[in-house]
Amino acid sequence: MAGTPYVRYVIAGVALLLSVKCEGLALAGDAFTGYQVDNKGEYFAYLGIRAPLMEERKGFQPFIQVFGAGVGYTFKDNGQERDANLQYVTPSLGLKYTAGSWSFLGMVGPQFRWKQEDQATGPRSNENFVGTYVQLEAFRWHEEGIFHAIASYADIDGFSYGRVRKTWLVHKSEQSCCSWYVGGDLAGMGNNQFYAVQAGPLVQVPINIFYLTLKGGYQYSQTFHSGAYGGVELYFPF
């Protein structure tokens, strides 16, 4: 039942963005999705859609973004492991500034969150939260590779997330498929109750308008210490 409003908000957000596209303005948007899991079965799955609200003027362009995600994780309470799940949806308004090959983005919006948590005794708890979400990004695209930095903060639980990604072109194909990029991620996340750090290589393959990314690496978390993670991402403009 807790997932029902989550799905409803995602559908509403997608419909809103599609209505923006259909009303107007032949403006390019972006869609991105992915799934990541670690060796303990903790996962993160997400879907995001971003669309501009008007044409770029003097490098500035406002946009709207809807981002939804589901997270499954394990925590320890008095030495006992317990499982929890949360889902959230964040509709945001943002501003993008482009200068040459660099783009800088900032966005803010409400975050709607639903959490289900195992209890020591009795049924799972179900809680709903509403808070504020802020995100900043810096992105540089070049044929030889990309640089992408992202930082976000949610005030519901004081959770911060940051990631830096760099890729390099290692094989260029003159056909529609397939050039190859290799690179790496360095990410950190946490609040006053939890923290984790991840680092690892990635491979990115453009296929027509799609960008497929495979990634994996080492993870250190407060809960389980050393571990490993792997994931897949898909990005495409529309």
Predicted regions and their residues:
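Bacterial N-terminal signal peptides that target proteins for export
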Residues: A2-I11
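Bacterial N-terminal signal peptides
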Residues: I11-K21
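Short glycine/proline- and aromatic-enriched beta-strand/turn motifs that initiate or cap beta-hairpins
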Residues: C22-D77, P237
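Short loop/turn motifs that connect adjacent beta-strands in outer-membrane beta-barrel proteins
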Residues: G24-A28, L53-F63, T98-F104, W141-I146, ...
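Outer-membrane pore/translocation modules
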Residues: V37-K40, F63-R163, G184-Y195, G216-Y218, ...
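Outer-membrane beta-barrel "beta-signal"
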Residues: E42, L47, V205, H225-F238
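Short, well-ordered amphipathic alpha-helices
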Residues: Y46-P52, P91, R163-L169
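Hydrophobic secondary-structure block in the mid-to-C-terminal portion of proteins
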Residues: T167-I207
